[in-house]
């Protein structure tokens, strides 16, 4: 939370980096490039957060209600939704507090505001880290279900899934607390960036391997049924499109934020980097957008979950 006098706050530390001058003007006393700042209105940011909040709350409620969805796979999906929900809550809470402080409707001592900012930062950082962890866990779960189908239920048991979930939440809280405490150190920023790259590589390798295996399986079935080549190619293109959407959404929504952190560590004073720093709020908005898209990719494609969700909505009326 960007609170003055809170240098150890995540958002305060990130936003306290040297920035360029406003929209489309060269920075003062510099010959660097013109800076384009994409402004995200507070109202739009709040709306995105509220949409994500409602959407992920429905996913968590549907999985909790239906016992048929209490499997390891849906436990990971539920935890991903919970992580995205916390991203939304922390983002909405931070924006609301800043608006109230700016309007003078919320009077608080500097120490109280600083403490609140640190709490929100830990919540936001831990929810981001856990969200990345659970995206990787879902990819591994799907990989095991395809390549070790006969042993899947003995490998991925509910007890092991629960232990993995507990370990992920504990690691997320610990790492985010350490990051907030040492966010002014370059090593802390780079560790977070390396973690993101590791999750990106893990997901890419697993999903690409799954796609190639599925294509080979489809070709084998096509040969048995003597189908034509265009049918095989059409299936392969569909799978490739799905993979491109999955990894593309992940990279486009998370990549700019971690590029921001990388540039803070590498070139905090460079004019071009300073231009990028001005769009930090846009990068946060993209992460909130990812929290909106995740249920569409990982949850709402399940007929069982959608059926339970309809029952919940009808019952509420």
From Swiss-Prot:
The chain crosses the membrane at residues 38-63, 73-93, 119-140, 164-183, 192-211, 241-266, 280-300. It is a multi-pass membrane protein. It is found in: Cell membrane. InterPro entries: GPCR_Rhodpsn (IPR000276), GPCR_Rhodpsn_7TM (IPR017452), Melcrt_ACTH_rcpt (IPR001671), MSH_rcpt (IPR000761). Its main location: membrane. Keywords: Cell membrane, G-protein coupled receptor, Glycoprotein, Membrane, Receptor, Transducer, Transmembrane, Transmembrane helix. GO terms for biological process: adenylate cyclase-activating G protein-coupled receptor signaling pathway. Residues 64-72, 141-163, 212-240, 301-317 are cytoplasmic. Residues 1-37, 94-118, 184-191, 267-279 are extracellular. PROSITE patterns: G_PROTEIN_RECEP_F1_1, G_PROTEIN_RECEP_F1_2. Gene3D superfamilies: Rhodopsin 7-helix transmembrane proteins. Residues 1-26 are annotated as: Disordered. GO terms for cellular component: plasma membrane. The keyword Glycoprotein applies. Belongs to the G-protein coupled receptor 1 family. This is Melanocyte-stimulating hormone receptor. It comes from Hapalemur griseus (Gray gentle lemur). The gene is MC1R.
